[in-house]
Amino acid sequence: MAKFGRILFKLVLIFGVIFLLLSGLIWNGYLLQVPTLEKIQSFKLSQASEIYSSDSVLLGKMYFENRRCISIKEIPEKLTNCLVATEDSRFFEHNGVDLKGLIRVGVKTLLLAENSGGGSTITQQLVKNRYPRSSFKNTNLLFHKVREWFTAMKVERLYSKNQIIEYYLNTVPFGHNCFGIYTASGYYFNKTPAQLEIQEMATLIGLLKGTSQYDPERNPKKSTNRRNLILRNMHEQGYLQKGELKKAIKTKLILASAEERELSIAPFFLQHIKIKVQNILSSINKSEYLHLNPYTDGLKLYTTIDSRVQKHAESALKNHLIILQKQFDAEWNERRWDNNKSTLLQLIRLKRYKGHKKVISLLESGSAFSPKIEEQLKTMKTDLTRLRAGFTCIKNTGEVLAWVGGRDFGYSQYDHVKSTRQVGSVFKPIVYATAVDQGVSICNYF
């Protein structure tokens, strides 16, 4: 018996040494491509750059990932509790890897053949978001898991629990190209995280399990069920009183409207300014010490546009075009040639008309074009009679206060402010005024 004990002790010792050796190699990145401490510290999240008017109104954004990072001070404690109760109830107890959770997963999955409910901690999820499995050559699931465990422990060594919560909530996607809790709060509820109510927090945290499946717009029933489950978990773990639970479950969820989400101020100007920003930064980035990317670096870009003047300009252009359109239609929609036979006969004799007649006969027979194309041709014909205009308001200093490139940016992105059409008679007052300044009499002929 004593001999068996010595053999067992030696085996345990040997395996222990091997385990420690492998752990050291993995920890230092010699095996499984585990990120180093320096690489983890140097990680930077992509943030959207925001474009503002001169009166500090957000006009639009430039981004690859629509994200704005916030500090833990801007994240309410209830939101942290909601996340912990849902994703990692022992978050404040483990060192990045929840051994109890792993045992539970193993027992349920292997022995009981039940759904284990997942075993990844918040820190491990953060690691997966930062370093996706697809970025590593080895595709073995076990190797991925071991890599995540060691990386999670490194993250816990570098950052406090609050910092990990902060990084996690700034990293995760919430659907609709919303990354991070700040952008998601604004998109779904038109609020900042600090303004969210508990049922709204639970709805957003519920999206982490599946952004499409639990989308409150597309799948309101599934979203509500998920939200209520999260609220009950919070109550069971002592984060929510019974009265708060009942109130939150009964409260109807009010999502932000499309108008609240849409940044529709000065769209033509934004189209122009985004190109300008890239050109300006290209010249600045020639310095070896500075390289700025408007789509990833979270810049704040301020313009001369005044949102109040812009709104008045857009309204004035639309209203005036309505009046002019009515006048145009009354004047030009009439088929005057029907009342003048001689003009009609002259038109029919033209070679150009004969060419059009062949096309018209093909359209009428249906032998050349599909109904869809014919409908598009009708739309194009209607467009020919639609009046277009552009408008700018510029101070004597050269600052652009308003920029209206057309009637409807959603319908046509052609910017009439930048168009190179001939000015026509609009230029005559400039010529005449210059002539008068030069002493030329208005009675002179040239």
Where are these regions (language model features)?
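Short, well-structured active-site flanking segments
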Residues: 92-102, 179-181, 241-244, 436-446
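Short pre-catalytic segments that frame enzyme active sites
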Residues: 60-68, 183, 212, 216, ...
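Flexible, acidic/glycine-enriched loop-and-adjacent beta/alpha segments
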Residues: 71-122, 182
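Non-catalytic, structured segments within soluble enzyme domains
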Residues: 23, 115-346
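N-terminal type II signal-anchor transmembrane helix
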Residues: 1-52, 90, 109-110, 324
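Short extracytoplasmic
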Residues: 42-68
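Residue-level preference for non-acidic, small/hydrophobic
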Residues: 21, 56, 83, 126, ...
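N-terminal post-signal-peptidase region of extra-cytosolic proteins
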Residues: 36-37, 63-72, 86, 149
